[in-house]
């Protein structure tokens, strides 16, 4: 296992929207910041589940696409040189005798003066395709996450799933891919009615009610064999890529073993956003307090509170109330 011996001022666990804003704000307070994210990309559920959906309750935006909001947050954070660690799930956090936190992930050990957890509903993993041969194609042309739509340009793509994410991906891929098919085990899709209407009015090949039965190909998937649910029909389609979108399973997992005060699967915090462990803060949907409302907008307010109090924890002489951002950037 690798070890990064550098001790950061703030380590943010979770790279969703609140985590990204937390990292930006940490930079504003001149803190060294590291983000640890379990998924292959930043953006959390916004990027992984509904990148094309509009969000209407972020201040200053009448409406904004989820992925556009993530892109804006990444651009905002890029003002500072933050360290980003992807595909690392934090397994344990321990406050050592010297007050420094030791964070152990599935692949690396990290050290930090303070920790701010912004992990939403906890770590979430994709529901995987339950076919015997599926695992051998992961990392090749079987995908659970999509980082760049352009990688599918001119290719034949099949999407498995019937929810919002599956329908969104199929519609987004239609103008880019050579051919798009969506396969769902039921005749009716669970996605938003407007999205389903757009799907049926598109050139996407809709195959229902079918389930995947076999993946054919040596090094990569070349054919997808489908079987009709409660029927005898079979379909074989030639594909270059398979995207599985069966949803995600989220849980606090090992977070429950870190000594934090947890109430109804949320971490209890004070008005400073500090947990029962000094120097360990939480913001966003992962935390709870009296009157807590779980919204992205709320998390954006909690992030500066957590950062400013983390700064004061590290340096008692530091101002909890910061300067206005205009005085910091406009010189």
UniProtKB/Swiss-Prot annotation:
Species for this entry: Bacillus velezensis (strain DSM 23117 / BGSC 10A6 / LMG 26770 / FZB42)
Known partners and oligomeric status: Homodimer.
InterPro entries tied to this protein: FAD/NAD-bd_sf (IPR036188), FAD/NAD-binding_dom (IPR023753), Fd--NADP_Rdtase_type_2 (IPR022890), Ferredoxin-NADP_redctase_2 (IPR050097)
Pfam (any one): Pyr_redox_2
Position of the signal peptide: none
Name of this chain's protein: Ferredoxin--NADP reductase 2
GO MF entry, a single one: ferredoxin-NADP+ reductase activity
Named cofactor requirement(s): FAD
EC numbers on record: 1.18.1.2
Keyword tRNA processing: no
Family according to the record: Belongs to the ferredoxin--NADP reductase type 2 family.
Keyword list, A-Z: FAD, Flavoprotein, NADP, Oxidoreductase
Superkingdom as given in the UniProt entry: Bacteria
